[in-house]
């Protein structure tokens, strides 16, 4: 295989934080990644336009003129107050995330407060990014139903750099599993990891879910050899069954701390958010997931 350089090797870690229970974990995962990569962190908080309630601006015919003018004035003042409080909350969130990361030993380059759509902000900032870090769910997600955050799918579809999806709580990353299907995306991802310091020195399991073919066995042997040549401790498993079931069980029984997988592709394991495979996997695995392009 030809060695691939990790995209934007000089870029920073960009971590998007909000008021969800994932905020602290995002900061912790970003600090871990930045330390491994030898880079700094930019923290981003977006005052999402979609989250702003509509302002009542046209009430002609519904109220007498004086009452309408009074109410419009009160609504304008309430809007201004809400905007001020949201900005202040955003600054507090960013300050808290930055302090948490610095306490963990990370270098924080910038904190960014944007009034924008999250996706637009991430795409605009991507040229300076080496790795994105987002929480699995945002502050508006339906936790009772276990839904993934509404932004996550759109972000994964749009960005071109690796994305670390933080779990609800951070714990030290000691063992890694790569969901391997022999596809070009995953093969390229392995080369990216070899070229990167992110997982260097960590033991890796190559986990294949589904039919064990001669072609797949050869691919596993080749990739395992490449990783071993790069200094990784590697083992491999080929397990029949549905990917979401096999991988979730393997993560649990082998005490895996980080799952690595390709974000897109035509095989069942990489049909991200098309059908239920990866959605079910992200919901079932209570660990961070590194998505590669």
Q: What are the roles of these predicted feature ranges?
A:
Residues 30, 97, 122, 193, ...:
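Aromatic/hydrophobic pocket-lining residues that form π-stacking "cages" and hydrophobic walls in ligand
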Residues 75-99, 103:
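Alpha-helix-centered segments that form part of catalytic cores
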Residues 2-76, 158-161, 171-238, 256:
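Small/aliphatic-rich secondary-structure junction motif
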Residues 224, 242-252:
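A short, acidic, amphipathic alpha-helical segment used as a generic capping/interface helix at domain edges
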Residues 1-3, 9, 22-29, 35-36, ...:
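Gly/Ser-rich helix-loop-strand patches that form or flank binding pockets
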Residues 24, 80, 84-91, 187, ...:
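Electropositive phosphate-/nucleotide-binding environments in soluble metabolic enzymes
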Residues 116-119, 239-245:
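Conserved active-site histidine-acidic residue motif and adjacent donor-binding/catalytic loop
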Residues 102-110, 228-235:
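A short helix-to-beta-strand connector/capping loop
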